[in-house]
């Protein structure tokens, strides 16, 4: 009887105070001339219980603001720095200046060595740079605490339908297969930027808006026994399948960017952006996984914190969750924990 009461109490506690589920991360870009300071921005992260951030470069002011906050960090190596990191000494210096000087006060989780590098334009330096950064981490005995990866985009995918047939393009396998092998051998994860928005606007005839916005009332695509009610799950399973075909087995995939613009292009509206971000955040917090990998949490980073008026083309300026005056565009709950707060 005592055991029964304990189980009931645990159940009630779980319902009233949900503590499981992935926290939703946010990408923090700084390409705007009207944005809040880095310290004000990190304070905004904390006010809204945003527990994960992706930085695209080792901005010193942002890193200082992140000290002792407990916010997990993906720190990026800019593409322009990759070639220099093929020199082991330069990689050690980069790690010392941009990671070790802040650790452990800053909670680094991943080092993203490059973002959406084209295999034909710099692809040859990505893996050597990754290896050197990893070796530098190993020299500091941090290789098990901070993982090395790189962020890819969906242009590397060749076959994408059905999701179980996902495969990388034949002409990029020389690049991506060794990267996946490295990630597998170091127990890391692949970072993937996944945008249902661009898939939809590129093919609105075959992809419905409701499928892209998580608002379809029923399954839209069947892949054998797997039913897909939203495009995000389908695209992520395409990446999982492609990774498997490149020898990665069950290598985790982190969705390092996903977003929907509120202005500036086809289907770019406030209402569509609100639907996409709120529905994606809810799905991430629920830890439901995908049809291919059900029940596995999907670490996901929403793109982006602010509208950035110095980006181009026009569509790229309007992915912000917040206006530059720090006011939210729409309510989003970033964490499922009991102290989680919704942006009102």
From Swiss-Prot:
The keyword Signal applies. Keywords: Glycosidase, Hydrolase, Plant defense, Secreted, Signal. Its EC number is 3.2.1.39. GO terms for cellular component: extracellular region; plant-type vacuole; secretory vesicle. One of its GO terms (molecular function) is glucan endo-1,3-beta-D-glucosidase activity. It catalyses: Hydrolysis of (1->3)-beta-D-glucosidic linkages in (1->3)-beta-D-glucans. SUPFAM superfamilies: (Trans)glycosidases. Residues 1-21 form the signal peptide. The keyword Secreted applies. The active site is at 116 (proton donor), 257 (nucleophile). Pfam families: Glyco_hydro_17. InterPro entries: Glyco_hydro_17, Glyco_hydro_17_plant, Glycoside_hydrolase_SF. Induction: Induced by infection with the Cucumber mosaic virus (CMV). (Microbial infection) Specifically down-regulated by Heterodera schachtii (cyst nematodes) in nematode-induced syncytia. PROSITE patterns: GLYCOSYL_HYDROL_F17. Belongs to the glycosyl hydrolase 17 family. May be involved in plant defense against cyst nematode pathogens. This is Probable glucan endo-1,3-beta-glucosidase At4g16260.
